[in-house]
């Protein structure tokens, strides 16, 4: 895909070579955005990236390379999308400008509302991130991370409501969704496996 010249203000692209190999990272644009946030004295810098391969759960080498670059340049949190599947979530300790800090990445948050049923894409989540500012230093840091398991139910073509976004644990407590209990349990297990974490808020 080659972007027309007059589309330069409509998107911030990850790569300079969208029409070929997706290997030339658009470092200048990415780092300019990070610098702009720093210049505003942002308490937290969060990068939201549309990346990865559809229905692939594990990140590829290029995603890891981009994540490392962003973290080393001051980004605190990376939230990914595009694959339609919830991907790995992890906290890291990085050293930036000689100081250690905790950063977080969610490679893909999956779908929030969708009619897709491919793979395990109906098992999704809502991410909860908490930040705390030190009253003395003014430094802001990640203080809590969890996710709420969610399931996108397809009730069929004849249903009054075809698709529903169901917070799994509250839905499990309702008799209205008793027949979905095995599906909910499987979704919880899938999310734990896909994220490679114990960040489920129900743990």
Ranges and model annotations:
Residues 1-203:
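Acidic, metal/ion-coordinating pockets
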């Amino acid at each position: 895909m080659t972007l027309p010249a007059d589309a330069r203000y409509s998107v911030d692209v990850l790569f300079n070579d969208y029409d070929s190999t997706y290997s030339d990272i658009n470092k200048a644009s990415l780092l300019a955005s990070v610098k702009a946030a720093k210049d505003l004295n942002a308490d937290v810098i969060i990068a939201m990236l549309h990346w990865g391969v559809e229905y692939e759960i594990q990140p590829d080498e290029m995603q890891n390379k981009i994540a490392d670059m962003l973290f080393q340049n001051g980004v605190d949190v990376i939230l990914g999308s595009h694959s339609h599947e919830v991907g790995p979530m992890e906290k890291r300790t990085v050293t930036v400008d000689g100081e250690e800090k905790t950063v977080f990445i969610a490679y893909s948050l999956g779908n929030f509302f969708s009619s897709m049923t491919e793979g395990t894409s109906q098992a999704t989540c809502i991410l909860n991130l908490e930040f705390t500012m030190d009253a003395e230093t003014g430094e802001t840091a990640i203080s809590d991370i969890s996710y709420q398991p969610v399931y996108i139910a397809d009730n069929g073509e004849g249903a009054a409501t075809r698709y529903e976004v169901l917070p799994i644990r509250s839905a499990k407590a309702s008799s209205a969704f008793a027949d979905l209990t095995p599906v909910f349990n499987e979704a919880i297990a899938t999310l734990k496996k896909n994220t490679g974490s114990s960040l489920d808020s129900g743990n």
